[in-house]
Regions:
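A structural signal for small-residue-enriched, beta-sheet-centric alpha/beta enzyme cores
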Residues: 1-85, 94-384
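Generic structural marker for isolated residues within well-ordered, non-membrane alpha-helices
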Residues: 90
């Protein structure tokens, strides 16, 4: 599993001392080639962390040899010194690996507004390089965790023997675009940078961009896709894009399943919308209703809160034609009372809300979670 499932990649995860608790906090992923094609998508937040600004520039070259990822500090809103530290991180990785700093992407996650302890991070890169292994993917995934309770990995296999693997972190600040998350995807398929970019953007649009835990957009979101071509197989575009989408969907689902304080995973299906964009807008608006999220936490099938959220959007619909189902029970029909709400079984982890707009044939799925006291507690004490 993870980033070393594909041939041509090595990874490591270590405790460099960035986190005060001594947990793993530094990961290194290296592409040994023969190709080093790469693509990336980043946060749409206008306040971008230093590693995002750096990696955006690196990706313009279409090649990435290595990725350095740290948890325990976001290196966001840290001024010129923060960018200098990111540059120094890439330079150190390039030095120990024998490559160019211009091919080293950097990603960070953690508290905003705090400079990284470079006296620990830079030596840690050398230590991580010494521990690089074709079996190091799981350790790398563990090292990028922040408030995550579990590490997240996924893999998909192509029929001709090529692979797409990946790792992700994220538990809070999960909201489009991208959803806080760091993701590294790897493939040993022989795919050029332009094709990687197309497949990655198509995949993130319908996966990570549709995970919306708490409506808060990170400064550090980074999703990278690296190709080694080590399998020697050049798959057709559709097969390759489907594999990338499968891995992204798996990881996005894991992100929601590990959202901070969550006890329910909520799948919001918007159907019969006039356009896909309107379906996404409605789904996202429902996902951001704190009233609804609290109701789901209390296992209350309060369909009125769904209709109330829909009504705030600009989507095309007639109020007296709206239908809402919760876990398969149509509790609202024609904009009014539907089937007996007591028939709704909400005892299980997953809750499915279906909103039928009766305005067309477009649809979309958005994932979110409930709002709990644990979420409030965790985020009220995050920096203390």
């Amino acid at each position: 599993m993870s980033v070393t499932a594909a041939k041509g990649f090595r990874a490591a995860g270590i405790a460099a001392g960035i986190k005060e608790n001594g947990n793993p906090d530094l990961a290194l992923v290296v592409n040994d080639g023969p190709s080093r094609a790469a693509a990336g998508v980043f946060t749409s937040n206008r306040v971008k962390a230093a590693p995002v600004l750096w990696s955006e520039q690196v990706l313009k070259g279409g090649e990435v040899t290595a990725v350095v990822l740290n948890s325990g500090g976001a290196n966001a809103c840290t001024g010129p010194k923060g960018f200098q530290d990111t540059h120094a991180t890439a330079e150190k990785a390039a030095e120990v690996l024998g490559h160019s700093a211009g091919e080293v992407a950097v990603a960070s996650t953690g508290l905003i507004g705090v400079l990284l302890p470079m006296d620990k991070l830079l030596p840690g890169i050398g230590q991580a390089a010494a521990e690089l292994s074709e079996h190091g993917g799981e350790k790398a995934a563990i090292a990028i965790k922040t408030t995550d309770t579990v590490h997240k990995t996924a893999v998909a296999q192509g029929e001709a023997g090529w692979t797409v693997g990946g790792m992700a972190k994220g538990a809070g600040m999960l909201a489009p675009g991208l959803a806080t998350m760091l993701v590294v995807l790897t493939t040993d398929a022989d795919v050029d940078a332009a094709t990687l970019d197309k497949a990655l953007r198509e995949a993130t649009r319908v996966t990570f961009d549709r995970a919306d835990s708490d409506g808060c957009m990170s400064t550090n979101d980074t999703v990278l896709l690296l190709a080694s071509a080590a399998s020697g197989v050049a798959p057709g575009y559709q097969e390759f894009a489907e594999a990338v989408r499968t891995v992204c969907a798996d990881l996005a689902r894991q992100l929601i399943g590990d959202a901070e304080g969550a006890s329910k995973d909520i799948r919001i299906e918007v159907v019969n919308a006039a356009t896909e964009d309107e379906a996404v807008d409605v789904g996202r608006t429902i996902a951001r209703s704190n009233l609804l999220k609290c109701a789901i936490h209390g296992e209350d099938p309060n369909w009125g809160r769904v209709l109330s959220a829909i009504g705030t959007t600009s989507a095309a619909f007639e109020p007296d034609r709206l239908n809402v189902a919760i876990n398969g029970v149509w509790v609202c029909r024609g904009g009014s009372v539907g089937d007996d709400r007591d028939l709704v079984d909400m005892r299980f982890r997953e809750v499915v809300i279906t909103a039928d707009l009766a305005a067309g044939d477009a649809s979309a799925v958005i994932w979110t979670n409930d709002l709990t006291a644990d979420y409030v507690h965790e985020n009220s004490a995050y920096s203390s």
